[in-house]
């Protein structure tokens, strides 16, 4: 929308209309709804060079694996793998939100965002209480919390009318199916990510700084 408001037109639409690219044209192309390229066509031939400005907005996060949901010690968890350079110890007991899309078996795509609204639940990676973590606290920061420990707590309440195993896991799946119509198999075609929940806030009495998720590396796009 902002590109079009600044005079850029879709390259695909221009080609479909049989229009040729002319010097001075502003065109854009989108790939898989994830990347965007904008071109300001110059006057000189390409052999004389071009200016390229690149920026990315992907940020360190925890991506949900394809077969992520499991139950352990009467708790339901999501298995994740971290993306980007994260300090893993900073992600424990931090309120997390889940963002992404799920492509269902019928082809429908469901957008999922939970944890950002005040009425939403949040999620977290669990950690040991301080008086139970003597061994952990002897380790280095890099060793105290490992990537394998970055599992996200989803729930603890079991199905009451089921005497089988994994009752907490199935209770969570019932909630997901009720709200989004998704099944466990749909995780195979999902792109879901866990990020710190909460809006950007100003820092300091003078409000001179900003605290928010994603400075690395959305600031370069800004």
Label the predicted regions.
Residues 1-222:
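N-terminal hydrophobic/helix-forming segments and targeting peptides
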């Amino acid at each position: 929308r902002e590109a079009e408001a600044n005079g850029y037109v879709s390259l695909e639409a221009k080609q479909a209309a049989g229009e040729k690219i002319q010097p001075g044209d502003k065109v854009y192309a989108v790939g898989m709804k994830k990347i965007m390229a904008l071109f300001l066509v110059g006057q000189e031939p390409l052999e004389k060079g071009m200016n390229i400005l690149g920026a990315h907005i992907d940020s360190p996060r925890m991506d949900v694996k394809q077969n992520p949901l499991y139950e352990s010690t009467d708790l339901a968890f999501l298995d994740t793998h971290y993306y980007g350079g994260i300090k893993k110890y900073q992600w424990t007991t931090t309120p997390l939100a889940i963002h992404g899309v799920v492509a269902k078996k019928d082809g429908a795509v469901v957008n999922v965002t939970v944890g950002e609204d005040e009425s939403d639940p949040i999620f977290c990676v669990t950690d040991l209480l301080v008086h139970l973590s003597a061994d952990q606290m002897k380790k280095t920061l890099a060793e105290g919390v490992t990537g394998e420990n970055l599992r996200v707590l989803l729930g603890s309440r079991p199905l009451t009318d089921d005497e089988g195993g994994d009752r907490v896991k199935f209770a969570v799946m019932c909630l997901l199916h009720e709200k989004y119509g998704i099944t466990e198999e749909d995780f195979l075609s999902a792109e879901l990510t866990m990020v710190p929940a909460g809006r950007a806030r100003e820092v300091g009495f003078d409000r001179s700084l900003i605290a928010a998720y994603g400075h690395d590396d959305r600031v370069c796009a800004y």
